Amino acid sequence: MSYVKYEEFLKKYGTPRTDAEGGEVALKKPDAIKALDLLKNTDIGILGGDVYELEGDGYFQPAYDNWYCDKNSDEQAIFAKKSRKMAIEYLLNYEEKPDADIWYVIVTDR
């Protein structure tokens, strides 16, 4: 896929975390996993991500959970693949509280 498809997906399925233009976009878990899959055949790496709980008033409360991937000396393509795998594993293994409205922000190196 391409970064353009990824950005289009974020616009369609994501929710802006703040009112800032070009700011972070939060996604529900299935959409976050799909967004990462859209970057599969690119050299775009995932620097990390943050977890938020959406409160009733629309405020994204930090859950103080996150992940990150160090680039080290990896080539870009290797880092991109490694970091996407790490992000997907984090999302799949993250246990959401049943009564919480959990959202994820993905941080790319682009």
Where are these regions (language model features)?
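Amphipathic alpha-helical binding modules
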Residues: 77-110
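N-terminal targeting/docking segments
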Residues: 22, 28, 47-49
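Structured alpha/beta or helical-core interaction and ligand-binding surfaces enriched in interleaved
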Residues: 18, 25-35, 41, 72-76
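Acidic, low-complexity, intrinsically disordered interaction modules
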Residues: 44-85, 90
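Acidic, Ser/Pro/Thr-rich low-complexity regulatory regions
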Residues: 15-20, 29-33, 99-103, 109
